[in-house]
């Protein structure tokens, strides 16, 4: 069978839905042709018992998927994959959403297990030429529903787990009023959730001393965009290394602000302003758990891993 040369991926995350069209080639084996995202929080309600996708969330998600498929169409990909992560995986009505998406798009929606998600994120990371110098390192991918944690030794995955520490999930669980300033109590509750999850997960920080940590997902992308706006440069011109001190300073800055004021911060998407405090707190809890002073940021995560799978690279 002839290997495909152009593929497309729609990554249905908890806080946004992203599309990637890619072809074989480039330094990491994958050359992106289109990279587009739509803020569409399908995960509202996943903090409930049991977690459920709301009707509004499913409708908004379906509209975003149709919009991205329209953007993909001119590239005529030979294979197109739709994948869903924590919000759909954990929702009691996740399979109903998958059936709805297949009915309106004609594409089957693949609901990834936590292990599949973590491993595909790892596969995507290794396609990033900017990380080619890393041999043994950790990867943390924070979404709206979950936190994927990986450890690479000699560029091979040694550990991969999924923890229920997504920023939408923790905001619903730990922040009584997301429109109000982020209180010390909420910060402590998010930290406690993270410590408990790491403590019971069996994830080991056992790589050689000095092994780096990569952070992916919208949280650090947002931090870099805020830095870019304040520096008068584009996001790619900012450093991909984000210090823990910078994360802590940004959290201290936004924690005292009510939601309307947070939404005025240049570079901070309005749709993420309510969950960013919990997201930054989670990143700081990861740094504490692993004794990291900084993270390297990469945009090559899940959708790049799925593209690598489709392209067979």
PLM feature segments, named:
Residues 2-31:
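N-terminal basic/disordered segments at the start of proteins
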Residues 4-7, 21, 43-70, 74, ...:
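Helical "lid/coupling" subdomains associated with nucleotide-phosphate turnover
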Residues 15, 78, 293:
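Short acidic/polar active-site loop segments enriched in Thr and Asp
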Residues 16-18, 146, 220:
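Structural motif
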Residues 28-42:
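N-terminal glycine-rich anion-binding loops that anchor highly charged ligand groups
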Residues 138-146:
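A generic, well-ordered mixed alpha/beta core segment in the N-terminal half of proteins
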